[in-house]
Structure formats: structure tokens, C-alpha cells
Swiss-Prot record:
This is Chaperonin GroEL 3. Keywords: ATP-binding, Chaperone, Cytoplasm, Isomerase, Nucleotide-binding. NCBIfam families: GroEL, PRK00013.1, PRK12849.1, PRK12850.1, PRK12851.1. GO terms for cellular component: cytoplasm. InterPro entries: Cpn60/GroEL, Cpn60/GroEL/TCP-1, GroEL-like_apical_dom_sf, GROEL-like_equatorial_sf, TCP-1-like_intermed_sf. It catalyses: ATP + H2O + a folded polypeptide = ADP + phosphate + an unfolded polypeptide. Forms a cylinder of 14 subunits composed of two heptameric rings stacked back-to-back. Interacts with the co-chaperonin GroES. The gene is groEL3.
Length: 549
């Protein structure tokens, strides 16, 4: 395939044009008085948002060379969002400033590799400075401040997120769901909740509520399919002699085996319920083992040399209470050892640290939360679908920021911590172009505060100059126009968000500065193409070979 190439200064300028196009669209949303962006959708109403990564994901430039620059900055926002869940606009603004200042230095004759070394050394020094001055989140009030700030100063969202995390803790699961009812509410689930319910409505014990409630039941855990009555009979006889009730978690129970259990329930001879085991494939056995630890039982599986016809009461799990509905199962106060449960949680945390796939990370986080006994559900309702999407984005950003604050602590917000950390760069001894790399970082870290001030209607340069002279932790509150202690204003940022924004921006910017050649597929003119606005290159009759079937 033929390729189109650009070199040296021209290549870097095209990349910078793409960086600026994306960053200019995103940075107007920064700060408490940032504006929204309206994004067209080919189907349905447009999306209104001030979430940086949501805007960045929608941007695709026509010029393929400039588009590469835009995609690199999009990677900055995406990486920051994936790691910290917030701070995407700050990361984008930092990346733009680093690229602008860095390319100016390269045009002046600086060696890009030495600039890169200086930038990396400066970022490392700033991260050490954040560690020195970070504070811990002290109580729900601090958490609410962080959450409110991330939700664009919506105190109601901040309070709800703080209440949710305050109850379930950093390891707990907080899910965000759409609600048909206008407003915002949070509910909590005690114990372990699974998404699977009973296999048959004949298993309910309360016909009004259509739920099966069991006290001190025996619980059989297996990853096998059960269809024959003979397979279950040994377990039923054991539980019957013990005078108990039985809950079966299995891959499936069907045919005569299910019919027998249903008949026993209908006639009142033996109470039991069947729930499909959680998870799929290899994850099913892992999640069953989680349940076994929580319930103090064993998973009956042929892989472990165990069979259903030789089950003992000691291999069955126990709990104080289990409630099963058509779609969910809640288990409270399992009989498992606290020591073993904590050991299992630690094992899952180690797996989470190694996991790279986002789906695996979410699954592990959910499993940790189940064993920790903490699940909260935030339900979000709005008048219109457009408002609902915008509100959901703010709740998710708020939740991510609050989690980050619990994980690594907080620093002064509103761009103050970044600007005032510049004092750490004074102690960094570098020479030549590496020293210029340090100064590039010094100038770039003032940009978030400058744009927060500009978006609020103030002189950005004047605000930066004044905050640089204030005592550490004192800054500019763009919401009110006041100068003072940022913690007192309730303007605090998670260290994790600030750190990830700086690291992601510096990583991409340093690589971009060392670029000398751009290579794209050559665009082929197709004058016979039908123009259909809104469909990119294909709409204009410009087709790349990779788009041709």
C-alpha cells in the first residue's frame, strides 16, 4: 500500500495542530465554571457533557497527520480516566502545554532526547513533592468535598457519593444505575448479593413478596449440572436428618432433579431453593470458591476429587439468613472463618494489581466487595434522557474522585498543588537541554490553574502570579473569586488524580517531542462517491485502502 509521509518541522507542526484541536475542545470544561460541549449523535439526541474523556473520545480529525496528534492526547485522557477515573481535562491541558513549550524548545535547537530526560526528571521530583504534602481523608465531610468538586460543585451528588463510600469503604462496590424516578438516592445491601435468583417460582416462601427466605440453611456449592434425582438424594437425606433447609448453587438443575425439589416445596415435605451459580466459564469456579470461603463450606467439583454422592454436612456452607428473589440472592452472615475471608480478600487484591483487562479488574473489584460485605447502589433519575446522561457522567466522575482520595489522600485543589509544587524543581540540578526540559514542566504545571481562572472569567496570568506567591495550600477559589486556604474552601483534589494526570501527559508529550517522521496511508480520491454529511472521509469521496473491503 502507498504511504504518505511528513518529516521534521512539518511533521511536528501537524501533530501540534491535532493536539491543539482536541485540547481546545476539552479545556473549556475545566473548573467549577467550565462550560459544556454538545456532541452530535447519528441516532438519538445529542449528548451534553463537561466530561473531558467523553468529549475526547468523539474527536476524529479529517487531516490524518493532525489526527495522529489528537489521538495521542486522547490516549492521555483515556489513560488517566482508566487509572484514576477523573482528571482527564487536567491531563489534556497539561499535555497541550508540554507539547507547545517542548516544540518551541526543539525549534530553537534543543535536543529532543535531552528535553525528554529533563521532563521525566522534573515529573519525578513533583511526584515526590505531592507525597510530602498530601493529607488523608478525615471523615465523610472531606469525602463529600472531593466528590462535590468532581461533580462540578453539585453538593447533592457529593453527599450521596460520600454516604455510599462512607458505608461500604474503599473496597466496597458502588454501582450507578438509571432510575425512572427523578432525583438521586442511595441504597445499601448487607452481606453478599448475587445477580441470579431462584430457578422456579414454586420455591418462594412469601407469595406476596415473591421471595424465598431461609434461616440457617445448608448450602450446597457445585459447578456441575444436576439432572438425576439419585445425584441429589444423599445431600437431601443428610439435610433432612439434620432438620434443615437446603439451597443449591449449581451450574444448572433440570429435569427430574428439579421436578423433585419443586414437588417437595409444593407439598411442604422439604424446603429447598436452586440458584444458578454466579459467573461464567473459568470465573464460575473462582466465584464459587469465594462463596465457599464466606459460607465455611467446600465447592463440590470433580476437579478436586469430590462427588455429590459422598457429600458430608461439614462440606456444606451455612449462613444466618438467605433471601432469594426472581433476579437476586442475598446471603447474610456466612459461617466462614474471618481469617480465611481476609486471606481470600488479600489474594484477590494481589490478582487485581496484576490484572490488565478492564473487565477482569471490574470482576475482581466486585468479588472483593462481596467478601468485604459492602455494596451500595446509587440510582440517578432526570427529566430527559439528555439530562440523565450528563448527570450519570458527573456521578461517575464524583465516585472515581472520591475513591482516589480514599486510596492515596488529597492535596490542595483547583490547580494549586501543581503550581506550588514547582518549588521542588528548584532543587533539581540539571544542565543544558535537560534543564530546559525542567523549565518546560515548570511552565506547563501553571496551565490548569490558568484555565480554571479563565473559564471563571478572571485574568489567568494574574491569578497564577498571585497564587505562586501565597503560602503552600493557599490558592484561588474560582467558584467565589476568593484567595485563601483551599482546604477551608472545601477545594481539595485526590493525589491519585493529580499524579495520574501529570504522568500521562508527560509520557505522551515526551514521546511526541522526539518524533521526526509521520507515516499514514495515502488517501485515494473517489470523485464518484455520494456525499453524505457526517460520515467522515467516506462522505467526501476520500477512501483509504484499509477502508476498502
Amino acid at each position: 500500500m502507498a504511504k504518505d509521509l511528513r518529516f521534521n518541522v512539518e511533521a511536528r507542526r501537524l501533530l501540534e495542530a491535532g493536539v491543539n484541536a482536541l485540547a481546545d475542545a476539552v479545556k473549556v470544561t475545566l473548573g467549577p465554571k467550565g462550560r459544556n460541549a454538545v456532541i452530535e449523535k447519528l441516532t438519538g439526541p445529542p449528548t451534553i457533557t463537561n466530561d473531558g474523556v467523553t468529549i475526547a473520545r468523539e474527536i476524529q480529525l479529517r487531516n490524518p497527520f493532525a489526527n495522529m496528534g489528537a489521538q495521542l492526547v486522547k490516549e492521555v485522557a483515556t489513560k488517566t480516566n482508566g487509572t484514576a477515573g477523573d482528571g482527564t481535562t487536567t491531563a489534556t491541558v497539561l499535555a497541550q502545554a508540554l507539547v507547545r513549550e517542548g516544540l518551541h524548545a526543539v525549534d530553537g535547537g534543543a535536543n529532543p532526547m535531552f528535553l525528554k530526560n529533563g521532563i521525566e526528571a522534573a515529573v519525578a521530583a513533583l511526584l515526590e513533592e505531592f507525597e510530602k504534602y498530601r493529607g488523608e481523608v478525615e471523615g465523610e465531610a472531606d469525602l463529600a468535598r472531593v466528590a462535590t468538586l468532581a461533580a462540578n460543585n453539585d453538593a447533592r451528588i457529593g453527599d450521596v457519593v460520600a454516604a455510599a463510600l462512607g458505608r461500604v469503604g474503599c473496597d466496597g462496590v458502588v454501582t450507578v444505575e438509571e432510575s425512572p424516578i427523578f432525583g438521586l438516592e442511595v441504597s445499601f445491601v448487607d452481606g453478599i448479593e448475587l445477580d441470579n435468583g431462584y430457578l422456579s417460582p414454586y420455591m418462594v416462601t412469601d407469595t406476596e413478596r415473591m421471595e424465598a427466605a431461609y434461616t440457617d440453611p445448608y448450602i450446597l456449592l457445585t459447578n456441575e449440572k444436576i439432572s438425576q434425582v439419585q445425584t441429589l438424594m444423599p445431600v437431601l437425606e443428610l439435610v433432612t436428618r439434620a432438620g434443615g433447609q437446603l439451597i443449591v448453587f449449581a451450574e444448572n438443575v433440570e429435569g427430574p432433579a428439579l421436578g423433585m425439589l419443586v414437588a417437595n416445596n409444593v407439598h411442604g415435605t422439604f424446603r429447598s431453593a436452586v440458584v444458578r451459580a454466579p459467573g461464567f466459564g473459568h470465573r464460575r469456579l473462582a466465584e464459587l470458591n469465594d462463596l465457599a470461603v464466606f459460607l465455611g463450606g467446600q465447592v463440590i467439583t470433580a476437579d478436586a476429587g469430590l462427588s455429590l454422592d459422598r457429600v458430608t454436612l461439614g462440606q456444606l456452607g451455612r449462613c444466618k439468613k438467605a433471601t432469594i428473589t426472581e433476579h437476586a440472592t442475598t446471603i447474610v452472615d456466612g459461617a466462614g472463618s474471618a481469617t480465611e475471608i481476609h486471606a481470600r480478600i488479600d489474594q484477590l487484591k494481589r490478582e487485581l494489581e496484576r490484572a490488565e483487562n478492564p473487565h477482569d479488574q471490574d470482576t475482581l473489584q466486585t468479588r472483593i466487595a462481596r467478601l468485604s460485605g459492602g455494596v451500595a447502589v446509587i440510582r440517578v433519575g432526570a427529566v430527559t434522557g439528555v439530562e440523565l446522561k450528563e448527570k450519570l457522567h458527573r456521578v461517575e466522575d464524583s465516585l472515581a474522585a472520591a475513591r482516589a482520595a480514599l486510596a492515596e489522600g488529597v492535596v490542595a485543589g483547583g490547580g494549586t498543588a501543581l503550581l506550588q509544587a514547582a518549588s521542588a524543581l528548584d532543587k533539581l540540578t540539571l544542565t543544558g537541554d535537560a534543564a530546559e526540559g525542567r523549565e518546560i514542566v515548570r511552565r506547563a504545571i501553571a496551565e490548569p490553574l490558568r484555565w480554571i481562572a479563565i473559564n471563571a472569567g478572571y485574568d489567568g496570568d494574574e491569578v497564577v502570579k498571585r497564587v505562586a506567591e501565597l503560602p503552600r495550600g493557599h490558592g484561588f477559589n474560582a467558584a467565589t473569586g476568593e484567595y485563601g486556604e483551599m482546604a477551608g474552601f472545601g477545594v481539595i483534589d485526590p493525589v491519585k488524580v493529580t499524579r495520574c494526570a501529570l504522568q500521562s501527559a508527560a509520557s505522551i508529550a515526551a514521546l511526541l517531542l522526539t518524533t521526526e517522521t509521520l507515516v499514514v496511508e495515502e488517501v485515494i480520491g473517489n470523485p464518484g462517491a455520494v456525499i453524505a454529511p457526517g460520515f467522515g472521509d467516506l462522505a467526501e469521496g476520500l477512501v483509504r485502502p484499509s477502508n476498502i473491503a
